[in-house]
């Protein structure tokens, strides 16, 4: 991800639950910007529709430049506080960053393909932690399980990293495991139970 979007933000002059609620009603997301390059936490509001569109397009590891009333600040998403019922974004934590800086992020792992006939795959880890340049954070990693036989495994060490991205995750972290379908296991248990009953 070598590009980033610029989003306008306004400094918050009011605080508290009432102020945050009024901001959300007005279509704004209360947010806090923090980091080594920020002297003190900066409280701002961001347009909800614009930010939601950015996340849909760039993902949760998106880098964005805030235009805070004329002052530019490069940031990345650290936490999204989302309402579990409405999925509306209630609050944001944004980390102030600078070009050339490296950060640790959790990147989604996508599985593609089909394993050998008579088997199924189980994904044990949905993300892996890597260190990458702030302007080159991978959107996702893809692993292929095409034709893999029973017992085959894919670990974090098997994922191909590009550029200067490095693995932070334990290399032995299990990502995908090829196993027997659960139905077959249940059928085997039933057959064993039937055999035991027949011998009694």
Swiss-Prot record:
Statement: the UniProt record of this protein carries the keyword Ribonucleoprotein: yes
Family matches, as Pfam families: Ribosomal_L25p (PF01386), Ribosomal_TL5_C (PF14693)
GO biological process: translation
InterPro entries xrefs: Rbsml_bL25/Gln-tRNA_synth_N, Ribosomal_bL25/Gln-tRNA_synth, Ribosomal_bL25_b-dom, Ribosomal_bL25_C, Ribosomal_bL25_long, Ribosomal_L25_dom, Ribosomal_uL5_bac-type
An annotated Gene Ontology molecular function: structural constituent of ribosome
GO CC list: cytosolic large ribosomal subunit
Record bears the keyword Ribosomal protein: yes
Domain of life: Bacteria
Keywords carried by this UniProt record: Ribonucleoprotein, Ribosomal protein, RNA-binding, rRNA-binding
PANTHER family, A to Z: RIBOSOMAL PROTEIN L25/GLN-TRNA SYNTHETASE, ANTI-CODON-BINDING DOMAIN-CONTAINING PROTEIN (PTHR33284), RIBOSOMAL PROTEIN L25_GLN-TRNA SYNTHETASE, ANTI-CODON-BINDING DOMAIN-CONTAINING PROTEIN (PTHR33284:SF1)
Described purpose of this protein according to its UniProt entry: This is one of the proteins that binds to the 5S RNA in the ribosome where it forms part of the central protuberance.
Subunit structure: Part of the 50S ribosomal subunit; part of the 5S rRNA/L5/L18/L25 subcomplex. Contacts the 5S rRNA. Binds to the 5S rRNA independently of L5 and L18.
Family under the similarity heading: Belongs to the bacterial ribosomal protein bL25 family. CTC subfamily.
Protein name listed in UniProt: Large ribosomal subunit protein bL25
Organism: Corynebacterium glutamicum (strain ATCC 13032 / DSM 20300 / JCM 1318 / BCRC 11384 / CCUG 27702 / LMG 3730 / NBRC 12168 / NCIMB 10025 / NRRL B-2784 / 534)
């Amino acid at each position: 991800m070598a590009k980033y979007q610029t989003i306008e933000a306004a400094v918050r002059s009011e605080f508290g639950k009432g102020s945050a609620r009024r901001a959300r009603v007005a279509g704004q997301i209360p947010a806090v910007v923090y980091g080594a390059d920020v002297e003190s936490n900066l409280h701002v509001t961001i347009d909800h529709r614009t930010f939601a569109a950015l996340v849909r397009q760039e993902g949760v590891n998106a880098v964005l430049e805030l235009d805070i009333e004329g002052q530019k600040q490069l940031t990345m998403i650290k936490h999204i506080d989302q309402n579990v019922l409405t999925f509306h974004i209630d609050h944001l934590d944004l980390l102030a960053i600078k070009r050339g800086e490296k950060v640790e992020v959790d990147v989604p792992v996508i599985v593609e393909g089909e394993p050998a006939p008579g088997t199924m795959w189980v994904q044990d880890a949905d993300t892996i932690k890597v260190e990458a340049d702030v302007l080159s954070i991978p959107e996702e990693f893809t692993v292929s399980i095409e034709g893999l036989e029973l017992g085959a495994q894919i670990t974090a060490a098997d994922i191909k990293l590009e550029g200067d991205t490095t693995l932070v995750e334990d290399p032995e972290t299990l990502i995908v495991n090829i196993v027997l379908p659960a139905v077959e296991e249940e059928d085997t248990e039933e057959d064993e139970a039937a055999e035991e009953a027949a011998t009694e």
